[in-house]
């Protein structure tokens, strides 16, 4: 039996870590290494000392790892960077159809050495993942099993089985799990419903919420998505986050935020202005982006130009019309997802529409 060592870094009260970081490894007879800190030096030591082969994490942590690696790559002398890029290109060519961690370790040994030299698979879930980030790690020889699930469905509903790797989906339903798309629109997008033994029986002491969430044995997830021609599930956003324009177009903030991903700020979030201020309108603006700058950072022309350049990539009806500088850290869940409703309420109570600057 192959030796497996799982690194657990998420809070143990989070469903994905409990299932993927503990129950799953124990069933496989694997070793579990649980860290109570995300300090880089401790994480690096764990990779090397315990020969970590698998790791579960949420998209925000994966994104931070990507930023760290890109920063290290940018520090390389020109000749070494050129050589690294060619090796990455070769690895991409040789592993296009199927991952080969052993081959990738030979080609990109120094990169893999930074992760202990034994890492085979990253498992990510708990929020929407940026396909570009998933592809970045796959191209380095670290396959990312991107999945979708809810605590109400025992964590996992679909998982990408990596045969072949696809960065744009959350995979196919797991065995024994049925998934339907309810009331699809013209593009096939509708609410995702789940049925199977993995679905919870009820919410504790909340029969009304249970009745709203489980209908005829189907769990209504509140997430929107569609199946592609290969049977892979693709997510669009949260039903309650969806914005309907005056022209009848559906907009998902998560799609817009993908375009702004990599913006050099601490964090950001896209809202509909009339969601934050229900009785007010900000000129003709439908959307705005709330920005939390890094400590000591100033909003300058470089950042403004970056915002505008990204905004121009969007279709006209999806473009952000203004921005707001927010001085407090965004509230987050245990899986590090932004609490949109709580943040919107805070902005609505403590900021005036005059704080919105036009783009």
Name each model-derived stretch:
Residues 1-5, 12-105:
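Conserved AMP-binding/adenylation subdomain of ANL enzymes
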Residues 271-272, 288-289, 308-359:
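Conserved C-terminal "lid"/linker of ANL adenylate-forming enzymes
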């Amino acid at each position: 039996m192959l030796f497996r060592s799982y690194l657990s870094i998420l809070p143990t009260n989070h469903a994905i870590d409990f299932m993927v970081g503990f129950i799953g490894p124990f069933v496989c007879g694997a070793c579990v290494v649980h860290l109570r800190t995300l300090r880089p030096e401790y994480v690096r030591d764990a990779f090397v000392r315990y020969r970590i082969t698998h790791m579960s994490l949420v998209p925000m942590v994966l994104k931070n790892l990507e930023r760290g690696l890109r920063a290290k790559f940018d520090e390389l002398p020109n000749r070494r960077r050129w050589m690294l890029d060619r090796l990455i290109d070769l690895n991409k060519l040789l592993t296009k159809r199927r991952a080969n961690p052993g081959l990738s370790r030979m080609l990109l040994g120094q990169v893999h050495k930074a992760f202990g030299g034994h890492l085979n698979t990253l498992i990510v879930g708990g929020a929407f993942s940026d396909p570009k980030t998933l592809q970045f790690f796959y191209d380095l020889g670290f396959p990312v099993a991107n999945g979708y699930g809810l605590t109400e469905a025992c964590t996992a509903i679909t998982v990408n089985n990596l045969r072949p790797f696809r960065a744009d989906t959350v995979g196919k339903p797991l065995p024994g799990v049925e998934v339907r798309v309810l009331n699809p629109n013209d593009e096939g997008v509708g609410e995702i419903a789940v049925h199977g033994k993995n679905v919870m029986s009820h919410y504790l002491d909340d029969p009304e919420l249970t009745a709203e969430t489980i209908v005829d044995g189907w769990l209504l997830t509140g997430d929107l998505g569609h199946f592609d021609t290969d049977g892979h599930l693709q997510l669009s956003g949260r039903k309650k986050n969806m914005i309907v324009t005056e022209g009848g177009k559906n907009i998902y903030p998560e799609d817009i935020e993908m375009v702004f991903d990599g913006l050099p700020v601490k964090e950001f979030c896209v809202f509909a202005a009339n969601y934050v201020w229900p009785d007010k309108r900000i000129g003709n603006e439908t959307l705005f982006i709330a920005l939390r700058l890094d400590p000591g950072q100033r909003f300058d022309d470089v950042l403004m130009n970056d915002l505008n350049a990204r905004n121009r990539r969007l279709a006209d009806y999806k473009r952000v019309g203004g921005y707001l500088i927010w001085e407090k850290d965004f509230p987050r869940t245990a899986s590090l997802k932004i609490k949109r409703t709580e943040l919107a309420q805070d902005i609505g109570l403590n900021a005036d529409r005059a704080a919105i600057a036009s783009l």
